[in-house]
């Protein structure tokens, strides 16, 4: 049987980090087994579902590179199918109409609680065989089996057993004419041939209810894999403040999509002690059965380390567009400075994120207006005009502007003055960047461009008072 998985977010908010991991594991499992991955949008909550959230989910999936073979499929476009299946259950005596008011339902629950029983529907309409009537309280309820036990072997959690006596006759169609979650997902997964349902363990309690519906429909029951939640660094439930933010905020924070993918893959799954994986390695090695049953903790330092690895090792040309995105967010005119790929080469050993890289790179795209006063006092003092002047002279004479030609000119300047390279580099670094910290001096000067470098040296000479 061909493996088919699905990711089925509700568009009531953005795709957060937990949802992204679920999508990744569903995608990896399908790809690992040579199967198909389906994207379904569970938008039957009409009050909370928004087009903005749908667009954000699709954008995040695209940014992460999680392509789907089918979809997006929208539940709101399948209501007629849900009605058809509900009517089938009604005709077979496996579901029934009920018309209790909210007050009557509240009274049932209160009576159960007074007896120290679980608050739930008491099955009052179960055997009444009530006909359809136009009523604002009309619902369709599923006849849950009265006796026996629901047993399933979760691919992550192991064997789980729940007595049917713990379950009531749940509503499968609401008064507004829309299906409930537990009913719609069963019909969807049945129709779509889903073989493995991979989702968060907050859905474990839904699973026995859904299995009973599958069996009532004589539909094949898929395998289930319930992943533990992701905790924050203190071991508490994730919040927006501690990492549960919109996935696209990780893009804005300067993380590479494949770095986030690598990190999320390891957030609950492992292959020995290996930390870094190519996409092909993930596809070859991932098996949902190997996902840990214990909750994973978010570790932003580890994510930073993974991201820095890819900043250091990826082709600079592939990183450049993402650096340009970060620079644009800072209001930088990219055309006013060096090629982004050259900036990547210069800075990637010094930062963990593209946001940091962009912030450091601004100096090469905008006029230098401020200087670190401590750096000026130390390196642009009287006497610094000598190495600066010689460097300017030789840089102005460079034929083809490159890191190599700049490096040669600066070494020639140091040799001509019989100075160590640091005596040339440090005043030049302050002249170009306004600070005493920057990448290799040849890269620093090269990125300023010939005209920009000469202008900044001239400004430094004026500052020294030796122009």
Curated annotation (Swiss-Prot):
EC number, as in UniProt: 6.1.1.17
Reaction(s) this enzyme catalyzes, per UniProt: tRNA(Glu) + L-glutamate + ATP = L-glutamyl-tRNA(Glu) + AMP + diphosphate
Annotated Gene Ontology cellular component terms: cytosol
InterPro entries: aa-tRNA-synth_I_cd-bd, aa-tRNA-synth_I_codon-bd_sub2, aa-tRNA-synth_I_CS, aa_tRNA-synth_I_cd-bd_sf, Glu-tRNA-ligase_bac/mito, Glu/Gln-tRNA-synth, Glu/Gln-tRNA-synth_Ib_cat-dom, GluQ/Sye
Matching Pfam families: Anticodon_2, tRNA-synt_1c
Chain location of the short sequence motif 'HIGH' region per the record: 9-19
GO biological process: glutamyl-tRNA aminoacylation
Keywords (A to Z) from UniProt: Aminoacyl-tRNA synthetase, ATP-binding, Cytoplasm, Ligase, Nucleotide-binding, Protein biosynthesis
A molecular function GO annotation: tRNA binding
The keyword Transcription is assigned to this record: no
Main EC class the enzyme belongs to: ligase
Span(s) of short sequence motif 'KMSKS' region: 237-241
Binding site for ATP: 240
Subcellular location: Cytoplasm
Domain of life: Bacteria
NCBIfam families: gltX_bact
Quaternary state and interactors: Monomer.
Function summary: Catalyzes the attachment of glutamate to tRNA(Glu) in a two-step reaction: glutamate is first activated by ATP to form Glu-AMP and then transferred to the acceptor end of tRNA(Glu).
Family: Belongs to the class-I aminoacyl-tRNA synthetase family. Glutamate--tRNA ligase type 1 subfamily.
Listed name of the protein: Glutamate--tRNA ligase
Organism of provenance: Xanthomonas axonopodis pv. citri (strain 306)
């Amino acid at each position: 049987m061909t493996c088919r998985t699905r990711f089925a977010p509700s568009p009531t908010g953005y795709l957060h980090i937990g949802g992204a991991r679920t999508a990744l594991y569903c995608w990896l499992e399908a790809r690992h087994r040579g199967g198909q991955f389906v994207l379904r949008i569970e938008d039957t909550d009409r009050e909370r579902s928004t087009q903005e959230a749908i667009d954000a989910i699709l954008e995040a999936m695209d940014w992460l590179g999680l392509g789907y073979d089918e979809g997006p499929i929208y539940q709101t476009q399948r209501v007629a199918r849900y009605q058809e299946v509900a009517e089938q259950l009604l005709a077979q005596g496996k579901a029934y109409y009920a018309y209790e008011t909210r007050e009557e339902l509240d009274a049932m629950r209160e009576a159960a609680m007074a007896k120290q029983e679980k608050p739930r529907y008491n099955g009052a309409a179960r055997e009444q065989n009530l006909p359809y009537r136009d009523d604002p309280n009309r619902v369709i309820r599923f006849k849950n089996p009265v006796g026996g036990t629901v047993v399933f072997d979760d691919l992550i959690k192991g064997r789980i057993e729940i007595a049917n006596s713990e379950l009531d006759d749940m509503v499968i169609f609401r008064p507004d004419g829309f299906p409930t979650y537990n009913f719609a997902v069963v019909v969807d997964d049945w129709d779509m041939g889903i073989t493995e349902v991979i989702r968060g363990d907050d859905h474990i309690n839904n699973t026995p209810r859904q299995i009973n519906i599958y069996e009532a429909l004589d539909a094949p029951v898929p395998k289930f894999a319930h992943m533990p939640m992701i905790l924050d660094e203190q071991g508490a439930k994730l919040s927006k403040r501690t990492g549960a933010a919109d996935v696209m905020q990780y893009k804005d924070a300067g993380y590479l999509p494949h770095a986030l993918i690598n990190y999320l893959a390891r957030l609950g799954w492992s292959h020995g002690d290996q930390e870094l994986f190519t996409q092909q390695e993930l596809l070859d090695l991932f098996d949902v059965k190997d996902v840990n049953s214990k909750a994973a903790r978010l570790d932003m330092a580890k994510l930073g380390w993974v991201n820095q690895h890819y900043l250091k090792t990826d082709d600079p040309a592939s990183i450049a567009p993402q650096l340009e995105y970060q620079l644009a967010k800072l209001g930088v005119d990219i055309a006013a400075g060096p090629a982004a790929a050259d900036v990547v080469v210069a800075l990637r050993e010094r930062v963990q994120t593209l946001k940091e890289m962009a912030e450091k790179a601004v100096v090469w795209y905008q006029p230098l207006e401020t200087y670190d006063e401590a750096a000026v006092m130390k390196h642009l003092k009287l006497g610094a005009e000598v190495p600066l002047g010689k460097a300017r002279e030789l840089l102005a004479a460079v034929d083809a502007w490159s890191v190599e030609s700049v490096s040669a000119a600066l070494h020639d300047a140091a040799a001509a003055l019989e100075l160590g390279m640091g005596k040339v580099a440090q005043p030049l670094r302050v002249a170009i960047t306004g600070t005493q910290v920057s990448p290799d001096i040849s890269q620093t000067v090269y990125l300023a461009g010939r005209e920009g470098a000469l202008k900044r040296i001239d400004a430094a000479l004026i500052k020294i008072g030796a122009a």
